UniProtKB/Swiss-Prot annotation:
GO molecular function: 2,3,4,5-tetrahydropyridine-2,6-dicarboxylate N-succinyltransferase activity; nucleotidyltransferase activity
Compartments reported by the entry: Cytoplasm
Keyword Cytoplasm: yes
Organism lineage: Bacteria, Pseudomonadati, Pseudomonadota, Betaproteobacteria, Burkholderiales
Pathway: Amino-acid biosynthesis; L-lysine biosynthesis via DAP pathway; LL-2,6-diaminopimelate from (S)-tetrahydrodipicolinate (succinylase route): step 1/3
Organism (species): Albidiferax ferrireducens (strain ATCC BAA-621 / DSM 15236 / T118) (Rhodoferax ferrireducens)
Sequence positions that bind substrate: 106, 143
The protein's name: 2,3,4,5-tetrahydropyridine-2,6-dicarboxylate N-succinyltransferase
GO cellular component, one term: cytoplasm
Assembly: Homotrimer.
E.C. number: 2.3.1.117
């Protein structure tokens, strides 16, 4: 079934200029809806983990998400007294209390998750935003004003602190999703974008900005890398000298590896997860 879906989506993508909500084969409409429904339920995900730091991105699923915008008309949506006009309904709009309880997710007003995102059991959404295609795994907290971008992959027992931005892939188009692996702590107002991978058990300090062009300096090895934070790293914002010290450019600095002291400062509070 998955191979058949992929073939339909890939063919529709090549013909996307000729598609619209009023001019698309039923086979394509059904395939796109099938993918969005499976993303919403966690049966499909845009990227799957092979090992620590190694992920496979399923481009055809990302194409299906993009096609869904082409094939869906805007419609009026209501949430209490609020009105919206959009193509993607909210994830919980039609769920009753029993269905919400069964999901195991806690949603604090006015948090929003779009249909096509997946939230595993034990996830807590403070007033935050989770976009279509995102996958948020068990026990993760998305704190106040944090945003999880389209197709981003968030691991188990992650804490996304207040105002954190996890970049999406839809605009501007990115090859791979931004990924935060298990047991990571992302400090307040930090931004991780452009398909950067933060490997498991890492701690990103407050106000760190990570994109594909951000130099990542490892103090222990005196090396610079890009696009990936190694497992168990503690990262702060800093700068590196350029042009023989005439000026400095922003950099993320790996100051040490996670130790017991770091864990004590960033441990999750089980009282908040009852």
């Amino acid at each position: 079934m998955t191979q058949q879906l992929q073939s339909i989506i890939d063919a529709a993508w090549e013909d996307r200029a000729n598609l619209s909500s009023a001019a698309a084969p039923k086979e394509v409409l059904d395939a796109v809806e099938h993918v969005i429904s499976d993303l919403n339920a966690g049966r499909l995900r845009v990227a799957t983990r092979e090992s620590v730091g190694q992920w496979t991105t399923h481009q055809w699923i990302k194409k299906a998400v993009l096609l869904s915008f082409r094939l869906t008309d805007n419609q009026v949506m209501k949430a209490g007294d609020l009105g919206f006009y959009d193509k993607v309904p909210t994830k919980f709009a039609h769920l009753d209390e029993e269905a919400m309880k069964a999901s195991g997710v806690r949603v604090v007003p006015p948090a929003v998750a779009r249909r096509g995102s997946y939230l595993a059991k034990g996830v807590i959404l403070m007033p935050s935003y989770v976009n279509i295609g995102a996958y948020v795994d068990e026990g993760t907290m998305v704190d106040t004003w944090a945003t999880v971008g389209s197709c981003a992959q968030i691991g188990k027992h992650v804490h996304l602190s207040g105002g954190v931005g996890i970049g999406g892939v839809l605009e501007p188009m990115q090859a791979g999703p931004t990924i935060i692996e298990d047991n990571c702590f992302i400090g307040a107002r930090s931004e991780v974008v452009e398909g950067v991978i933060v490997e498991e058990n890492s701690v990103i300090s407050m106000g760190v900005y990570l994109g594909q062009s951000t130099p990542i300096y490892d103090r222990a090895t005196d090396t610079v890398s890009y696009g990936r934070i190694p497992s168990g790293s503690v990262v702060i914002s800093g700068s590196l000298p350029k042009n023989e010290g005439k000026y400095s450019l922003y950099a993320a600095i790996i100051v040490k590896r996670v130790d017991a002291q770091t864990r004590a400062k960033t441990s999750l509070n089980d009282l908040l997860r009852d």
